[in-house]
């Protein structure tokens, strides 16, 4: 089954989106730290949009501090397989930019982005996309096959 790890601030927008997916999920808490034991797709909100010169990956601030702390645990980082980001289209090129940052830093695919708490179409797209994604992940990769 698709494993989801997500962070949601006090606005609860990301939490509401994840609830609508009706898939197993673990929430990164606001204060405590957690450790995961299975591969997962990370869902997170984007912070700090609206920079005059557009996205600046070196500036920081797009990824919530709680997510940074979670991913700074090498064990947690080793299990991430993809990222989905929430954002606000008012921020133009920075819409969902936390997904770009995590994708680059963790070398995983940026799978999808949605606005605020997502639409019904977003829920269906993510649910179907995760099903396909995990199916592909469970297939042996050429590097995992032994020469006979």
UniProtKB/Swiss-Prot annotation:
GO molecular function: FMN binding
UniProt protein name: Protein NrdI
NCBIfam families the UniProt entry points to: nrdI
Record-linked InterPro entries: Flavoprotein-like_sf (IPR029039), RNR_Ib_NrdI_bac (IPR020852), RNR_NrdI (IPR004465)
Family: Belongs to the NrdI family.
Swiss-Prot/TrEMBL GO biological process terms: protein modification process
Pfam assignment, any one: Flavodoxin_NdrI
Gene that specifies this protein: nrdI
Superkingdom in the source lineage: Bacteria
Function: Probably involved in ribonucleotide reductase function.
